Amino acid sequence: MTRRILIMGLPGSGKTFLARELCDQLMSRGMSVTHLNADAIREQFNDWDFSAAGRLRQAQRMRDLADSATADLVIADFVAPLPEHRVIFDPDYLIHVNTIDQGRYADTNQIFQAPACCDFVVTTQDADHWARQLINCLFNK
């Protein structure tokens, strides 16, 4: 069964850098990994709607794509600004990239709610370091 990691946080916090580094490190250890980047998915579906309905649709789309993956692990990086977006995606592991106080977009800053509970909090923009920490914490128990 494919496990899902959601790497979430404000735009510009370093989610994609961390997701890519984590994918690389896990693949070098022999795991099959699928990376879902929200911006790439929006581009693929030509859906740049950031309304409440558009954000919900994107969360469901990310979930559907994760559900159809055949890899050992799906790593998704997207803002997921509200708790309901995270519930829709239903991650096995929730990683909050909490490296900035304000993102690039005022509308996202206004609605963003940090998770009350998560599996791991990233506090600096050092993808290599945090990818190693995540692997140790999540996979070497």
Regions found by a protein language model. Give the residues of each.
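The conserved Walker
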Residues: 11
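Small-molecule kinase domains that catalyze NTP-dependent phosphoryl transfer to phosphate-bearing small molecules
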Residues: 88, 97-141
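Walker A (P-loop) ATP-phosphate-binding motif of ABC ATPase nucleotide-binding domains
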Residues: 4
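Conserved substrate/cofactor phosphate-moiety recognition/catalytic segment
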Residues: 19-64
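Conserved lysine of the Walker
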Residues: 15
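Glycine-rich phosphate-binding loop used to anchor ATP phosphates in small-molecule kinases
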Residues: 48, 53-105
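Hydrophobic anchor at the beta1->P-loop junction of P-loop NTPases
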Residues: 7
